[in-house]
Amino acid sequence: MRYAFLKHMKEHEAHAAQRGLGLRTYVVGSEGEETRLEAERIGHHYIEVDNKPLGAKFNAAVRMALDDGVDYVLIMGSDTFFMPSLWDQYRDLINAGIKYVGIRDLYMWDWNNDDARYWEGYGGDRFGEPIGCGRLIHKSLIKGGLYDSHRNSSLDASASRRLPKATVISCRQDLLVSCKEELSITPITRFPDAERVDHTMFLPLIP
């Protein structure tokens, strides 16, 4: 999955450029030389950071991008794939001056058994809160660390506490999909009420 994601993001650099957006991919790995070589051969920026605590690892990725002079940081996990059309939504909101964009919903696909589902997003007290991946955040909103550095879980909530309310969009048409396994931090089995969908619609997304 890792190499497929690296190729996927390289393709998205071209898709973003077609829409007038400059995209650079920053990879923060903890697997050593093999991952570094994979990332750098494709043309991505790479830094090695311990996998735990995850909060410190995520903060290192954000800091690497900010130190390189980017205007926005896009948070995307290495298990996530999406259609190029998502850039149309991001471009329009960037051009409108929006500083924080989030995605409210998500597709999930367990590669082990082809269980695929569509989740509409948080309800109750968390209604309207964006999911973790796909958050597009302007540099002016990031003061110090974006995440609690000591955390290995609840990272999305720790970032939300530091940020204003997001302008939230849907990925239903853009097929943002998180490829899950039972060993994932948030396995697909935690969403028993999510709508079941046909996994084959995600196949064209995987390089």
Can you say where each PLM-predicted feature lies in the sequence?
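Short beta-strand/loop segment that forms part of the nucleotide-sugar
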Residues: 17-33, 47-51
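Conserved catalytic core of nucleotide-sugar-dependent glycosyltransferases
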Residues: 81-154
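C-terminal catalytic/acceptor-binding lobe
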Residues: 149-207
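Glycine-rich, basic loop-to-helix element that forms the pyrophosphate-binding segment
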Residues: 51-65
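Short beta-strand-to-loop acidic/aromatic patch adjacent to the donor-nucleotide binding site
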Residues: 70-81
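Catalytic phosphate/metal-binding cores of nucleic-acid and nucleotide-processing enzymes, i.e., regions
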Residues: 4, 19-21, 55, 98, ...
